[in-house]
């Protein structure tokens, strides 16, 4: 049997409202997009790593450090739409992994875990979860995942789920990490679907898949990614890099 080809795609746009030009922000001497690209390469889980963008400045930067950039439409509303546009023209690629372009500390081992989910032929879509501490689980900014015994997601919510009716009942809550893998046909199908009621209510794009009956397998990891949302986050990430020695 021929093995599946797996590609990581890093969506990157220049026109961020809160942080214009974010992919090109310099962090410890390199652009943020290069940090993410390098960590994808370190994972050794992908046949290729591409950056999907609609901006020539990002394309030039990616090609400057030896990466491959694929130009996509400015009309793409989400990173998933951008990855799907790339996948539309590449029927030879089986597995597509959407890697957030604003997480320069993404752990290569977590990317390996995500790509590895698709060794199971029954997995159509995958993502990652991490164990939550009680103090962070209550925050609506931390998305919780409720899992079935086989690791499939039952639901994702900003609310504190599951609810513990009797105090003292032990429960492990899981936090969602926003990295996704798809089989090509699932990715293309999702990109064509309109937003769903629960997706609109929670503002969580992954609920579109669950509402349409597409199972999402979750790999459990321990590392926690750090996103760069604002210019002030750059210094925080640089401090973490220094603390970790890289």
Swiss-Prot record:
Q: Name one GO biological process term.
A: CMP-keto-3-deoxy-D-manno-octulosonic acid biosynthetic process
GO cellular component terms attached to this protein's record: cytosol
Named from the GO MF annotations, one term is: 3-deoxy-manno-octulosonate cytidylyltransferase activity
Q: Can you tell me which residues the record assigns to a coiled coil? A: none
Pfam family example for this protein?
CTP_transf_3
Q: What InterPro entries has UniProt attached to this entry?
A: Cytidylyl_trans, KdsB, Nucleotide-diphossugar_trans
Its pathway is:
Nucleotide-sugar biosynthesis; CMP-3-deoxy-D-manno-octulosonate biosynthesis; CMP-3-deoxy-D-manno-octulosonate from 3-deoxy-D-manno-octulosonate and CTP: step 1/1; Bacterial outer membrane biogenesis; lipopolysaccharide biosynthesis
Residue ranges crossing the lipid bilayer per the database entry: none
Q: CDD domains annotated for this entry?
A: CMP-KDO-Synthetase
Disulfide bond: present as a keyword of the record?
A: no
Q: Where mainly located?
A: cytoplasm
Tell me where in or outside the cell this protein is found.
Cytoplasm
Catalysis performed (reactions):
3-deoxy-alpha-D-manno-oct-2-ulosonate + CTP = CMP-3-deoxy-beta-D-manno-octulosonate + diphosphate
Tell me if Transmembrane helix is a UniProt keyword of this record: no
* Top-level taxon: Bacteria
Q: What is its EC number?
A: 2.7.7.38
Keywords noted in UniProt: Cytoplasm, Lipopolysaccharide biosynthesis, Nucleotidyltransferase, Transferase
Tell me the function of this protein.
Activates KDO (a required 8-carbon sugar) for incorporation into bacterial lipopolysaccharide in Gram-negative bacteria.
* HAMAP family xref list: KdsB
> Which family is this sequence assigned to?
Belongs to the KdsB family.
Q: What is this protein called?
A: 3-deoxy-manno-octulosonate cytidylyltransferase
Source organism of the structure = Myxococcus xanthus (strain DK1622)
């Amino acid at each position: 049997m021929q093995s599946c080809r797996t590609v990581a795609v890093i969506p990157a746009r220049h026109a961020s409202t809160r942080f214009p030009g974010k992919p090109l922000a310099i962090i410890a001497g390199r652009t943020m997009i290069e940090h993410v690209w390098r960590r994808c390469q370190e994972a050794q889980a992908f046949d290729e790593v591409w950056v999907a963008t609609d901006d020539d400045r990002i394309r030039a930067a990616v090609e400057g450090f030896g990466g491959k950039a694929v130009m996509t439409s400015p009309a793409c509303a989400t990173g998933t739409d951008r990855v799907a546009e790339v996948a539309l023209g590449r029927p030879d690629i089986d597995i597509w992994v959407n890697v957030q372009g604003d997480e320069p500390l993404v752990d290569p081992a977590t990317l390996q875990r995500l790509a590895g989910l698709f060794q199971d032929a029954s997995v159509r879509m995958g993502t990652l979860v991490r164990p939550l501490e009680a103090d962070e689980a209550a925050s609506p900014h931390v998305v919780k995942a409720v899992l079935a015994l086989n690791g499939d997601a039952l639901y994702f919510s900003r609310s504190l789920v599951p609810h513990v009716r009797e105090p003292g009942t032990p429960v492990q809550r899981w936090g969602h990490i926003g990295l996704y893998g798809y089989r090509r046909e699932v990715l293309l199908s999702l990109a064509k679907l309109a937003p769903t009621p629960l997706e609109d209510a929670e503002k969580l794009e992954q609920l579109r898949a669950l509402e349409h009956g597409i199972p999402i397998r979750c790999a459990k990891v321990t590392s926690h990614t750090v996103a760069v949302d604002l210019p002030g986050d750059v210094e925080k990430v640089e401090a973490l890099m220094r603390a970790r020695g890289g």
